[in-house]
Structure formats: C-alpha cells, structure tokens
From Swiss-Prot:
GO cellular component: membrane
Compartments, record wording: Membrane
Keyword annotations: Glycoprotein, Membrane, Transmembrane, Transmembrane helix
InterPro entries reported in the protein's UniProt record: DUF4718
PANTHER family xrefs: CHROMOSOME 1 OPEN READING FRAME 185, HYPOTHETICAL PROTEIN LOC689589
Stated name of the protein: Uncharacterized protein C1orf185 homolog
Membrane-traversing stretches: 17-37
Species this chain originates from: Mus musculus
Organismal lineage: Eukaryota, Metazoa, Chordata, Craniata, Vertebrata
Length: 230
C-alpha cells in the first residue's frame, strides 16, 4: 500500500510538469503569432510598394497629386472675405490719416503765412540773395584788383631796373621778397568784409561803456543820498 504522502508528492510533480508544459506551449504560440504578424506586415508593405510602383508606371498618381492644390485654392477662397475686410480697413485708415495731414497743413499755412509764400516771392528772395552775393564778389574782386595795381605801382622802379638785365635769373629773387613783404604788411582790417565786424564790435564796446557809466552814476547817486541822510 502506498502512503498518502507519496501520492501528494506525485501529484505535485505532475502539476509542476503540467504548468511548465503549458507555459512552454503558450510561449511557442505567442512567438508563432508574433512571427505571423510581422510577416503579414512585411507582405502588406511590399504589396503597397508594388501597387505604388505600378501606379507610377501607369500614370495613375497624377490626379492624386492635383487634388492638393485644389484644396489650397478652396481654403484661399474660404479666407478671402476676411482678407478683403482687412484691406478695406487699412484703406479707410490711410484715407483718414491723409485727411488729417492735409487739414493740419492748411492750419499751419494759416498760422504762418510767411512760410507758405508763393513760388514767385521765393524766387524774388532767391534773386535778391544772388544779387547780394554777386555784389560781394564784385567788391572783393575790385579790392583785389586795387591791391594788385598798388603793388605794381610800388614795384615800377624795380621793374624798370630789372628789365635790361633779364638774362640773369637771380635778379628776380629780391622782387619776390619785396612782393611777399608788401603782402604781409597789408592788414586784414583793410578788407571790406571785416568792416561790418569792426563796426559791430565798436558798437558793442560803446554800449558796454555806456552801461558802465550809467551804473557808476547810479552808485554815486545812491552814495550821495546816504551821505545826505546821515
């Protein structure tokens, strides 16, 4: 007779062996299913590539490619109303800005009539400025001619002496020295352009002296009043 402990031990062994065999079987089934799924995907992708290549060869993919720009065109037409409203708003804003600017220019011209003179007046002013410039240039040129004539008169004696022995080039050096000495002796105060500045400076000096005299007289008067009060 077998003991119950031996029976239980045999049952446990059989159960463990059955569990192992079931686990191995499930693992084998799962691996087989995974392999089949991967193979199916590969076959499906290969069939897709083949169909695409055949369609490319036959030219059946051209209408598919033309469908995309049609969609873009539809979307542009869909948003055209929004874009038109934006453009209209911008045009209105620009028109308002132009009107405000023109109104401000008119007001400025009314406030400052001198700045908004006619082109004829501006041309007359330009002509007067040109005439003053021409007068100043003529005055300066006449003054230069006078100085040159004076230099020629001053050097007539030396020129008469040096006309005969012109063959010797060294005789021209003293003439150059004399000319340079004469030009250096001319003071800048004789220039007509400086007369205005000199007169202006003299007027400023006289005004300052007058102010000093007035201040001194007032101080003396105050001092005399204080002395009389004491």
């Amino acid at each position: 007779m077998t003991s119950p402990n031996g029976v239980f031990s045999h049952l446990t062994y059989f159960m463990a062996a059955g569990a192992l065999s079931l686990g191995i079987g499930f693992f084998a089934l799962a691996s087989a299913l995974w392999f089949l799924i991967c193979k199916r995907r590969e076959l499906f992708e290969e069939s897709k590539f083949k169909e695409f290549g055949e369609n490319m060869k036959q030219g059946s993919c051209k209408p598919k490619l033309k469908a995309h720009p049609q969609c873009v065109f539809i979307s542009r037409n869909f948003h055209a109303g929004y874009l038109q409203s934006q453009t209209e708003k911008r045009e209105k804003e620009e028109a308002e800005k132009k009107a405000v600017r023109s109104h401000s220019k008119v007001e400025f011209c009314l406030q400052d009539p001198i700045s908004c003179e006619s082109p004829e007046v501006t041309s007359v002013a330009n002509g007067s400025s040109v005439s003053t410039l021409s007068l100043s240039t003529s005055i300066s040129s006449s003054y230069c001619c006078q100085t040159v004539e004076e230099a020629e008169d001053w050097l007539t004696d030396d020129c008469l002496e040096t006309r005969i022995p012109l063959k010797n080039p060294l005789l021209g050096e003293p003439l150059k020295k004399k000319v340079l000495a004469y030009l250096s002796s001319i003071s800048l105060e004789e220039w007509p352009g400086n007369t205005v500045s000199n007169t202006f400076c003299s007027e400023q000096k006289t005004d300052s002296l007058k102010e000093l005299l007035v201040l001194k007289n007032t101080e003396v008067g105050k001092h005399n009043l204080q002395f009389d009060i004491e």
